[in-house]
């Protein structure tokens, strides 16, 4: 997978972009967990390659709280693996505050999502992201909603991005719903009304 990921960086550069968004799985809260070292090694190799190509693997937030992800990224000593901040994933999965996450992860944010949702009840990220088997996946633990209808405080989120000087992309993400295209249009109007 590491070599395949390097080829994806090559392709991205050929397409004249320097950000590749991805999921890496669940970073364990405990750095002594065996998976932590494996993830550090793999991401360290990818970070070094991305750095050499002046590119970024942007890890999408969600499976862990911001402080855990920051500690993991700090251990790489590189910006080659950075952050695609998805505020709804914090709300829906970990219950972490996406506004505070902007400040915590400010040195690593290279891409962001505009997505909204609500957590219905807690399910371990280890289960949600397939690290552990469970029947709980059959029971919806969160719901993605049109922008402005969930629990993400978008005025505060946009203020935080502005506070840290973020000037990159803000990608509207809508994966579900009866009218995703209509929801995306409404989301664009909603964002314009706030910025």
Predicted segments with their positions:
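Active-site acidic/histidine proton-transfer and metal-coordination neighborhood
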Residues: 1-83, 92
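Histidine-acidic metal/acid-base catalytic patches
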Residues: 16-18, 44, 52, 66-195
């Amino acid at each position: 997978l590491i070599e395949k990921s390097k080829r994806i960086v090559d392709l991205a550069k050929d397409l004249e972009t320097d950000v590749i968004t991805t999921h890496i799985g669940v970073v364990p809260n405990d750095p002594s967990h065996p998976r932590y070292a494996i993830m550090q090694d793999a991401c360290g190799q990818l970070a070094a390659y991305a750095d050499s190509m002046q590119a970024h693997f942007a890890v999408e937030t969600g499976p862990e709280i911001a402080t855990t992800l920051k500690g993991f990224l700090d251990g790489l000593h590189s910006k080659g693996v950075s952050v695609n901040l998805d505020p709804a994933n914090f709300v829906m999965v970990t219950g972490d505050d996406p506004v505070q996450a902007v400040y915590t992860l400010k040195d690593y944010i290279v891409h962001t999502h505009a997505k909204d949702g609500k957590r219905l009840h807690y399910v371990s990220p280890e289960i949600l992201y397939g690290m552990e088997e469970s029947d709980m996946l059959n029971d919806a633990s969160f719901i993605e909603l049109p922008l402005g209808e969930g629990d993400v405080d978008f005025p505060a989120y946009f203020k935080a991005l502005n506070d840290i000087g973020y000037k990159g992309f803000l990608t509207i993400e809508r994966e579900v719903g009866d009218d995703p295209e209509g929801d995306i249009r409404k989301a664009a109007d909603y964002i314009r009304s706030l910025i």
